[in-house]
């Protein structure tokens, strides 16, 4: 855990906060989606995320940087947005149909898939430690779900 962009372990604190909020999201979504069309629920959630995101952009005065974004970055940000939308639509439908205790672990298999994709497309290292970690996550997911 090294120092990068803002101090030692700062990224780690944000990652832990992300995990906490993701856990809250799952529980709140499971309760909130009851009796609501999953696509409508995703749209409502997206409006809230959109308002919060743009609020932070203006609060931090980051809107001036929009003109500096390259075409390549725009393309990949748009593709990422499409992938996020597809993920959320599938996630909400799965939560509506299944138990949070089963849906969430399967959703977190994204960690394994991300590591493999990062190795293949971003040429990031995939060490023996990474392989063991992926195998443990996959095995743990199967253990919790089956």
Q: PLM features: residue spans?
A:
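Hydrophobic transmembrane alpha-helices of multi-pass small-molecule transport proteins
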Residues: 1, 129-145
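C-terminal transmembrane-helix exit sites in multi-pass transporters
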Residues: 112-131
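Structural motif at transmembrane-helix junctions in multi-pass transporters
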Residues: 34-40, 90-109
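Juxtamembrane boundary at the C-terminal end of a transmembrane helix
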Residues: 96-97, 125, 141-146
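Membrane-interface interhelical linkers
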Residues: 1-17, 36, 50-77, 88-97, ...
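Juxtamembrane helix-loop-helix junctions in multi-pass membrane proteins
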Residues: 24-48, 102
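Hydrophobic residues within alpha-helical transmembrane segments
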Residues: 13, 17-20, 44-48, 75, ...
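Hydrophobic/small/kink-forming positions within alpha-helical transmembrane segments
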Residues: 19-23, 27, 54, 81-86, ...
């Amino acid at each position: 855990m090294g120092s990068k962009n803002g101090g030692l372990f700062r990224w780690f604190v944000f990652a832990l906060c992300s995990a906490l909020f993701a856990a809250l999201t799952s529980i709140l979504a499971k309760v909130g989606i009851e009796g609501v069309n999953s696509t409508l629920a995703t749209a409502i959630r997206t409006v809230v995320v959109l308002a919060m995101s743009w609020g932070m952009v203006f609060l931090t005065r980051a809107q001036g940087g929009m003109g500096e974004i390259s075409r390549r970055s725009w393309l990949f940000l748009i593709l990422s947005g499409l992938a996020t939308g597809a993920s959320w639509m599938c996630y909400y439908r799965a939560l509506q149909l299944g138990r949070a205790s089963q849906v969430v672990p399967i959703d977190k298999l994204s960690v394994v898939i991300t590591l493999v994709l990062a190795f293949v497309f971003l040429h990031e290292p995939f060490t023996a430690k990474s392989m063991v970690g992926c195998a443990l996550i996959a095995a743990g997911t199967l253990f919790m779900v089956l």
